[in-house]
Each structure stands twice: as structure tokens, then as C-alpha cells.
UniProtKB/Swiss-Prot annotation:
This is UPF0310 protein PH1033. Belongs to the UPF0310 family. InterPro entries: EVE_domain, PUA-like_sf, UPF0310. SUPFAM superfamilies: PUA domain-like. It comes from the Archaea. Coiled coil: none annotated. It comes from Pyrococcus horikoshii (strain ATCC 700860 / DSM 12428 / JCM 9974 / NBRC 100139 / OT-3). The lineage of its organism: Archaea, Methanobacteriati, Methanobacteriota, Thermococci, Thermococcales.
Amino acid sequence: MTYWICITNRENWEVIKRHNVWGVPKKHKNTLSRVKPGDKLVIYVRQEKDKEGNLLEPKIVGIYEVTSEPYVDFSRIFKPHRGGKETYPYRVKIKPIKIGEINFKPLINDLKFIKNKKRWSMHFFGKAMRELPEEDYKLIEKLLL
């Protein structure tokens, strides 16, 4: 079993919950091809601003288990990044294990996969998902309310 942290925005987090599916754009299909049924996905909602310009802090919002092999589906359920046309067609079906919220920034010092604690956001830059050490997964699973 492999543990993954999956990077999304708040709007697509709602899609994930509603459809029980994780999707990535074409440029990340090779990463998704390594995902197998039984793997665990930790959903990370990135820092962003709301419509009023208020800063919304990054959070861990749930843990899911993968229930399918990767597949392709071009139906438009996800909102494209920055107004693009990408449909996040490379997908896996998932089921919820634990849903809740953890503020991410207080975890940074305890997460092993984040080597540069000052520039922690660079560990997510340009990625849709990345492997997560089991130790980090267990910490998140324990703290998720």
C-alpha cells in the first residue's frame, strides 16, 4: 500500500466528496498510473483567497481509499485550474475513510516529507499528488477530526 497527498482547491474538494473520485490533468497521468486499489489518499486543500479576498489557510480535509485502477473519463466534473480547459480525465474511484479538518501549517515541523520547513509550499508546487511516508500518514490520520 502506498500513501499519497493529493493537492486540490476548495471547489474541487466539493467535487471529490460528491462523486468519490480523484482526478488529475494529463501532465500528471504517469503519477496517477502508480496508484493502486487499497492505496490511501490524503486530501490537501491549498491556501487560496475567497471571493472577498480573505486568505483561506491550507488544510487537510480527508482520507480516502482507492477502490479502482486508474481510468480515463473526460466528463466535466472538476473545475479547471485558472480557467483552463483541462477536465482532470485521469481518475481513480475512491471511498471516504475519514473526513475532517486539520490546519496544515502547524503540522509542517512534524512532517518528514517536508525537508525545507521555511519554503514548505515548494513541496507541492507543480504537483497534483506525491507520495507520503507512512509515518506522516499515521500522524495525519491520528489528528484528523
